[in-house]
C-alpha cells in the first residue's frame, strides 16, 4: 500500500459533507458511489441517461446536437447538485458538474463536433451557473489506465459505448490530468482503481471510506496495487 500526499489549499466548505466522484468512462464511479452511499448511509445521486431527450439525436448527428446536449447536462447536473446541497444528509454524486465543461464539451470541441461559437457560449453559461454553486467538500478522482478502461467498457457491453475508442479515452485522460493540475475549488482525493476492487474486497472499500471521512485538507493519492 502506497500513499503519496501533496498539500494544496482547497476552497470553502459547506456545513455538511458533499462529495463528488470524477473519472474517465469505466473508472468505477457508479460502483464507488453506490457503495459509499450504502456504507455511510449517505444520499446518492447518479448520472442518468434514461430520460435525456437529446441523446438519440446526438448519437445520430453529433455536430448538430452537441450544444443542446451540453446545455441539458448543465441544467440537469446543477439541479441535481442543488437538491443534494439542500438535503441535510451527507451526499455523494456520481460525476461532477465540472467534467462537462473541462472534459467532455472540450473533447467535443476538439474533435470538431462543437463549433467555436457554441463552445464559447456554453462555457460562459457554465461559468455563470457554477459560480452560483457552493463548492463541494471533496472531489474523489478515480484514475485508471486507458487499457483497463477499454477492457471494462468492452466487458459491460453497453450499446451507447460501442463507438468508444482508446484514442477517445486517451484524449479524455489527458484533459483530466490537465484539469486536475489546476483544480483548486476543493480538496482532491485521487484513487487508482486499476487494481483496487472495492466491489468485491471489503477491506479496499474500508480504506477508501476512511480517507473520505477524514475530509481531506489537501491532495492525496491512494495506490493499493501489489508491489
Say what each PLM segment does.
Residues 8, 151-163, 167-227:
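NTP-dependent small-molecule kinase module
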Residues 21:
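Hydrophobic anchor at the beta1->P-loop junction of P-loop NTPases
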Residues 24:
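P-loop (Walker A) phosphate-binding loop of NTP-binding proteins
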Residues 29:
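Conserved lysine of the Walker
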Residues 32-33:
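Post-Walker A alpha-helix
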Residues 38-76:
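Conserved substrate/cofactor phosphate-moiety recognition/catalytic segment
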Residues 103-177:
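A glycine- and Lys/Arg-enriched "phosphate-lid" helix/loop adjacent to the NTP-binding pocket
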Amino acid at each position: 500500500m502506497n500513499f503519496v500526499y501533496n498539500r494544496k489549499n482547497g476552497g470553502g466548505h459547506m456545513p455538511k459533507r458533499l462529495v463528488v466522484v470524477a473519472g474517465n468512462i469505466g473508472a468505477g464511479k457508479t460502483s464507488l458511489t453506490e457503495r459509499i452511499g450504502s456504507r455511510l448511509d449517505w444520499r446518492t445521486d447518479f448520472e442518468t441517461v434514461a430520460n435525456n431527450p437529446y441523446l438519440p439525436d446526438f448519437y445520430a448527428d453529433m455536430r448538430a446536437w452537441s450544444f443542446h446536449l451540453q446545455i441539458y447536462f448543465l441544467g440537469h447536473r446543477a439541479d441535481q447538485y442543488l437538491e443534494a446541497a439542500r438535503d441535510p444528509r451527507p451526499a455523494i454524486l456520481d460525476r461532477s458538474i465540472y467534467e462537462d465543461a473541462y472534459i467532455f464539451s472540450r473533447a467535443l470541441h476538439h474533435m470538431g463536433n462543437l463549433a467555436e461559437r457554441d463552445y464559447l457560449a456554453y462555457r460562459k453559461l457554465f461559468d455563470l451557473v457554477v459560480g452560483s454553486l457552493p463548492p463541494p467538500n471533496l472531489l474523489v478522482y478515480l484514475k485508471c489506465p486507458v487499457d483497463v478502461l477499454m477492457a471494462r467498457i468492452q466487458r459491460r457491453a453497453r450499446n451507447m459505448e460501442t463507438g468508444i475508442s482508446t484514442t477517445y479515452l486517451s484524449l479524455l485522460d489527458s484533459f483530466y490530468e490537465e484539469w486536475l493540475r489546476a483544480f483548486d475549488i476543493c480538496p482532491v482525493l485521487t484513487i487508482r482503481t486499476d487494481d483496487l476492487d472495492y466491489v468485491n474486497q471489503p477491506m479496499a472499500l474500508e480504506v477508501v471510506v476512511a480517507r473520505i471521512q477524514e475530509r481531506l485538507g489537501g491532495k492525496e493519492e491512494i495506490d493499493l496495487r501489489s508491489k
